[in-house]
From Swiss-Prot:
Ca(2+) binds at residues 1266, 1268-1269, 1271, 1274. Residues 29-87 form the VWFC domain. The gene is Col1a1. Contains mostly 4-hydroxyproline. Proline residues at the third position of the tripeptide repeating unit (G-X-Y) are hydroxylated in some or all of the chains. Glycans are attached at residues 56, 254, 1097, 1354. Residues 1182-1207 are annotated as: Nonhelical region (C-terminal). Forms the fibrils of tendon, ligaments and bones. In bones the fibrils are mineralized with calcium hydroxyapatite. The modification Phosphoserine is found at residues 161, 260, 776. This is Collagen alpha-1(I) chain. It comes from the Eukaryota. PANTHER family: COLLAGEN ALPHA (PTHR24023), COLLAGEN TRIPLE HELIX REPEAT (PTHR24023:SF1082).
Amino acid sequence: MFSFVDLRLLLLLGATALLTHGQEDIPEVSCIHNGLRVPNGETWKPDVCLICICHNGTAVCDGVLCKEDLDCPNPQKREGECCPFCPEEYVSPDAEVIGVEGPKGDPGPQGPRGPVGPPGQDGIPGQPGLPGPPGPPGPPGPPGLGGNFASQMSYGYDEKSAGVSVPGPMGPSGPRGLPGPPGAPGPQGFQGPPGEPGEPGASGPMGPRGPPGPPGKNGDDGEAGKPGRPGERGPPGPQGARGLPGTAGLPGMKGHRGFSGLDGAKGDTGPAGPKGEPGSPGENGAPGQMGPRGLPGERGRPGPPGSAGARGNDGAVGAAGPPGPTGPTGPPGFPGAAGAKGEAGPQGARGSEGPQGVRGEPGPPGPAGAAGPAGNPGADGQPGAKGANGAPGIAGAPGFPGARGPSGPQGPSGAPGPKGNSGEPGAPGNKGDTGAKGEPGPAGVQGPPGPAGEEGKRGARGEPGPSGLPGPPGERGGPGSRGFPGADGVAGPKGPAGERGSPGPAGPKGSPGEAGRPGEAGLPGAKGLTGSPGSPGPDGKTGPPGPAGQDGRPGPAGPPGARGQAGVMGFPGPKGTAGEPGKAGERGVPGPPGAVGPAGKDGEAGAQGAPGPAGPAGERGEQGPAGSPGFQGLPGPAGPPGEAGKPGEQGVPGDLGAPGPSGARGERGFPGERGVQGPPGPAGPRGNNGAPGNDGAKGDTGAPGAPGSQGAPGLQGMPGERGAAGLPGPKGDRGDAGPKGADGSPGKDGVRGLTGPIGPPGPAGAPGDKGETGPSGPAGPTGARGAPGDRGEPGPPGPAGFAGPPGADGQPGAKGEPGDTGVKGDAGPPGPAGPAGPPGPIGNVGAPGPKGSRGAAGPPGATGFPGAAGRVGPPGPSGNAGPPGPPGPVGKEGGKGPRGETGPAGRPGEVGPPGPPGPAGEKGSPGADGPAGSPGTPGPQGIAGQRGVVGLPGQRGERGFPGLPGPSGEPGKQGPSGASGERGPPGPMGPPGLAGPPGESGREGSPGAEGSPGRDGAPGAKGDRGETGPAGPPGAPGAPGAPGPVGPAGKNGDRGETGPAGPAGPIGPAGARGPAGPQGPRGDKGETGEQGDRGIKGHRGFSGLQGPPGSPGSPGEQGPSGASGPAGPRGPPGSAGSPGKDGLNGLPGPIGPPGPRGRTGDSGPAGPPGPPGPPGPPGPPSGGYDFSFLPQPPQEKSQDGGRYYRADDANVVRDRDLEVDTTLKSLSQQIENIRSPEGSRKNPARTCRDLKMCHSDWKSGEYWIDPNQGCNLDAIKVYCNMETGQTCVFPTQPSVPQKNWYISPNPKEKKHVWFGESMTDGFQFEYGSEGSDPADVAIQLTFLRLMSTEASQNITYHCKNSVAYMDQQTGNLKKSLLLQGSNEIELRGEGNSRFTYSTLVDGCTSHTGTWGKTVIEYKTTKTSRLPIIDVAPLDIGAPDQEFGMDIGPACFV
C-alpha cells in the first residue's frame, strides 16, 4: 500500500541524494546516551514513547505523539506501543442515521485547469496483499445520485414490491396532498433538463454497492492522506522482467562506509606476490625414520697406488656435459597436481575515464513539476452566451441554496396531478416529545478522502517486517580488497620429511651405542654377469605348475584426492580499517562502454536538457548464460554511489489509504445553481417564526483564487537507508606499489621443473669405513702426472641469486616527440556542474515510456522517520463504502419555505395561522446534523507551513548504476605468511641426466641415522654465461613502477562531435514572486528550453539507518572486456623468497658411459654334458663291477673321496646330474620371474604399479605390461612413472598437424564439429605402442581400467584465431571444446562439474592472428572415461581459423 509516509520517504530520499552529492565524509562518531553507545546515524527507542537518533555525536530525541481525544469509551493499549487506540468494532455514538438519497445536482462550474499530468500506462497489477486492519471511520460521503423525476418519487419505495409502474406525463402541480403510502420504485426515466437547484435534502441511507464504474481519467493530484496502518505483508510477487535501461544520472557522492559484509569465500588467485626474504633456518627436527639407501658418496682423495684390484662396480654418473640445443616441444607432460591457489594480487591500475556512454532510451515522463507561483486574479471576463445543453455530467456536490426567486402569478388550477413530492419542510412545529431511539442506520457510503490534517508527530517505530524470501543469487562480486590477516590457525599436521640437507660438520665422536638389533635381510644383489653359454641340453619335460606367489606389498599412497566441496561460509570477519589512498596511477586507455545497468530509482525532475542527436539503435545482444557461482570474494570497499537511474514509469495506483481525520472547515464557497428538489427531510422541532428576508440577487461566480506561493523548504530530512551497492565501477587507476611486505613463509611446492644438469661434484665426504681388503692385484706402474685438461664448456647457469636492492630511480627520459594527431575522440563525460541558472521553462510532456514489468517485492524495510510532505498524488480509485463520517458543520439558514401540511410527527393539533413573532424561546436541543456542505471552490494557496519534523529514512532505493571508478586504494598491509603447503605429488619423469664420472666402489655401509641439515654452502663462483634458453612462461606481473614524467601535451585533436545532453541539474531555487498576470489561454507547445546550469551542492544529510539487504537484481548481461592498459614500467625486483621445496623429478638423463666391469658373478648353471671323452685306460683284469659308481654312505676317512650322486672326476659326471641341476635352476628362475616380473616382452608385469612395488629403485621409462595376464604375446609397451606408479599409454599418432581443418558452409552458424567424425582427413585417436594390434590394446585397456582407481590425460590445443576454452570477449565458456571419452561421454568446459575439464594454460582466448595454445587437463576416478578418443572445437570454420593438437598419454594408477 503506497501511503502518505511512503511518498514522503521517496521525496526525502531524493532530497538526501542531492544534499549528499559531492560532500566529504564526516568522520564517524558515536553517541553515549544513558550509558549506551550508539553508532552515528543509528536510531533507538529508550522507551516506547521516545525515539532517538545519533546525529554527529549528539542524541536527538522526540516523543511519540498520540491522538488526544479518542472517540470511544474504552481505548485500548498494546504492550510495547505508546499510543492507545479504539477497538475496531466500536462505532461512534455520533454516527447519524442517514436519510434517503438526495437528487442529482447539476454539474458544478468548471474548475481551473490543472497542471498537465503524465499519462502513464497502468502497470501490471501485483498479486493482492493480505488485507490490512480496517482504517478509522472516514468523513461523510458525498450525496448519492438522486432519483430521476418527480413522477418516480411519487411512487416511493417499498421493500416488498416487485413491480415497476410506468410514469405518466408531468402535470401542473396540484394542491399538496397527504403523504401517501410508499409506492413501488419507478423505472429509470430519460434525462430531463436540469432544474433549478433545490434545497439540499437530508443524507439518505447508504444504498447498495453499485457495480464498479469504468476507470476515470486521472484527476488532479489530491492532498496526500495521513498514512494508514501497514497491512500485513503480501506474498512476494513474481520476479518481473528486466526493465529498460534508464538514462545514466550524474555520478553520486561517495557513500558512507558500508557495514562489514560476511567473510567472502576465497577470492580468485592473484598474481604471485614478491618473493619474501629467506626465512631463518628452523630448529633441527627429530631424527626421521631410516631413509633409503643413499647414493654413492663422492670420490675420495686418491690413496697411494695399491695393487690392482678386481674390477670395480659401475661408476657414478659423470659430470655435466654442455647443455644441448633446445629440443622441439615435447608432447604434453603428465598431469601435475593442481597448484595451490595463489594470494590475491595487488589492485590493478585505475583505467582512464571511459567515453560518454551512448544516449539511453527516452525515459518515462518525470513527475509533475512543483506548482509555479500563482498569478494575480485576472479581470472578470464578459459573460458568454449560454451554450447548448451538455451531456449529463458526473453528479456535482450539492450547491448551497440559491437565492429564493419571486413568486410567480397564480396559474389556473390544473387537473389533480399525481401525488406530489413531499413539501418543503413546514415552519418548525413546537418541540415534540423525544421519539424512541431508532435502530442504527446502515453504514453510509465511504466518503472521499478528507483534506490532509496537520502533520502529526513522528510515529512510533514499527516492528521489523518478516524476513522476505531469499532473493535470487546475486552476480559474482568482483574480487574484494585483501582482508586483514585472520587469527593464527591451529598447528598443521606434521609436514613430510624434508629433503636431505647438505652434510653438516662432523660432530664429536659419540659414545658407543648399544648393539643394534639384527638388520633385516638385504635386498637381492644385482644380477651378475651372464656366464658363457653352455651347449644346449636336451629339452626337459614340462614341470608341474609352481605354487602361487605370495601377495605383493601394499602399494604407495595414492595421489591427493580431488578437491572437496567448498566448506560452509565462515562467520563475518571483523570490519577492516580503511587504507590510505594510494597515489594516482597513470591514466589507462579508455575502456569500451559498459553494458547498460538496471533502471535506477526515480530521480528528482531536472530541468529539461537540450535535445541531443538521436543515436542509431543497436541490436540487443544475446543474454549470456549465468556463470556458475564463484566463491564469494572478500567484501570490496564501498563503491561510490551509482548514478541516478532514469525516472520510472507511473506506478499502479496504490490501495486506498485510510481516511484522514476531518480537516478544518473550509471557507464558504460560492452558491451553486439550484439543484433538483430533494426529498423531505425529517420534521425538525418547531422554531420561532422568523421575519421573511429580502431576496438577494444571484452573484456571478468569482474567478478562482491565485495559488499561494511555494512554502519554505522543510527541515533537512534524515538520509535514506543505504542503497544497495552499485555495480563495480570500472577498474581504478593502478595504485603505487605497496610497501615491501614482510618475509613470506616458504611458498608452496612449485611445479616440478625439468631436471637440471648434474651439478659439480660436492666437497669430499668424510672418509668412508675401510673397505674389505680386495684380492691383491699385480702392482701397476705409477703413471706420470697428466697435463692439465682443456677448459671445460661453460657450466649451466647457477641458481638465481637473491635479488639486489632496488636501484635508484633513473633520470626522467628526454621529452618525446609530439605524437600524431589522434583520431577524433568520443564525446567526453559531462563537465563539472556550473552554478545554478534560473529555472527553465517547463518542458513538453515526454512521450510515455514503454511499460516496465513489475519488479519483485522487496523485503520490508525498517520503519524510518517520517518523510517530508510529498507532492499531491493523483486521486486513487474509489474506495469501498466507509462507516458514516462525523457530522458536518451546520448549514446556513435557508429561506422560509411555504407552509406545509401537518407532518405525521407532530403530537399537538393542527398548526394555526402564523402569529406575531413570540419572544425568543429557550435554546432548543441540538437538531440533527445537516448534510455535508458542498466543497467550496479552491481557496488561494495558504502560506507555507512550518518546517516538518525530520522525516523517516526513505525506502531503500533500487540498485544504482555502476559508479565512476573510485580512487585507487592504498596497498594493503602485508598479510601474514601462509603455512607451508603440503608437498605435491611426484611429477613426471625428467629427461635423462648427463653421465657422471665413474665413482670408486665402496663397501655397502649400514644406513646411518639421518644427519641434521647442514648450513647453506657459500655461493659458488659465477658461471660463464649460458646460451639463451627458450622463453619461459610469463612471469608474475611486476609491481607498478613509479609514474614516468608527464609527457608533452599532444596536438589538439579534431573537434569532437556534439556530445549527448548532460544530465539535468536539480531544480533551482524559486525566483522572487513576480506580479500576477491574467490567466492566458493555453499556449502552443513550446520548444525545448536550453539546458539549465547545474545546481549548487546541497548540505550533507544525516546518516541513514542500515536497511535490510534488497533482493538481488537479475544478473545483467556480460559486458565486453575492456582493452588492456599499457604495461607499467618494470618494478624493482622483490626480495628473494625462501627456497621452495624440491621440484618434481626431471626426465631421465641420457644413458651414461658404460661403467667399469662388475664383480665376478655367481657360478652359472652347469653346462650341458660335453662330448664323450677319449677312451679310458684299460680296466682291471677281473670281470667284476666298479663299485665306485654306486651310492656309498659318506665315509669319514674315505680314501677315494666317493660322493653321494656326485663325482669329482669330470669324466664320470652323469648326464642325469646335469639335467636335474639345469631344470632346478630354470624352475627357480621362472618362479622368481612370476613373483617379481621384469617388465620385459618375455616377462611382462601386470601394471607399472606392480613393477614399482617389486623394483622400487628402477627408473621411469618404457616397459611391457600384460594386464589380462595369460599368454604374453598380447603384452603392450607403456611408459611407467616409477615415482607415482602410473601406467601411461601413448597414442599411436600423438600430434595433429596445425592447419585449417574445416571450412563451415554457414560461418554464422557456429556449432561443435567432431575432429574424427566430421572433418575431412580427421581421425579418432588410437592408443598403444608402435606395431601393437588395436584389438589387443583395447582389451588390455579394459583390464587396466578395472585395476586402476584414477585416470588423467592432458591435451594441448594449438590455435590461431580459435577460442578453446574461455572467450575473452564475452567472459564465458560457451566456445569451449568438447572432448569424447572412451565410453562416449562428452566432457565440457562448463556445466555439471562431474563432466568438466580444467585448463593448465589458456592461451586461446581471442583472435589475435598468431598461434597460441591451451593445455587441457582431465582427471577422474571414473577410469572408463579415458583415454579421450575425439575432440570437437566450436570456434572454427572460417578460412583464417586454424588449429592443431598434441594428444598426451592416458595415465592410470
